[in-house]
Amino acid sequence: MKITYWSDFACPYCYIGNTRLKRAIKDLNLEVEFDIRAFELDQNAPKDVQSTTVERFAQKYGLSIEDAKKQVSQISSLGIEEGIDFKYESTLYTNTRDAHRLMKLAQDKHPETVEKLATSLFEA
């Protein structure tokens, strides 16, 4: 079976969904080939870190810093429930274009490394 999905390494829900998908595949004892496609949630995100995830949430959604911390903490809790060593609160907001380029290079030149690379990029 081949599964194609679009993902951004800056998206915590993509990481959580990827973890859930892999668990289901393992539980069902399926053989799967993944085709991971790039999707940039924010093409205009700066390359240089300018804000924390909490600050970005506050600005993007018009929240107080305290409310943004609560939202980010809820997302972290979802990841922890899935067994992810999730520290979303301390994630720095930056552009993911180069990470997607690296993934494309791996897919083209060393496809056997793609899953490990994807996990490493999510955990970075």
Where are these regions (language model features)?
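Short active-site neighborhood of thiol/selenol oxidoreductases, capturing the structured segment around
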Residues: 1-21, 34
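Structural alpha/beta surface segment adjacent to cysteine/selenocysteine redox centers
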Residues: 18-124
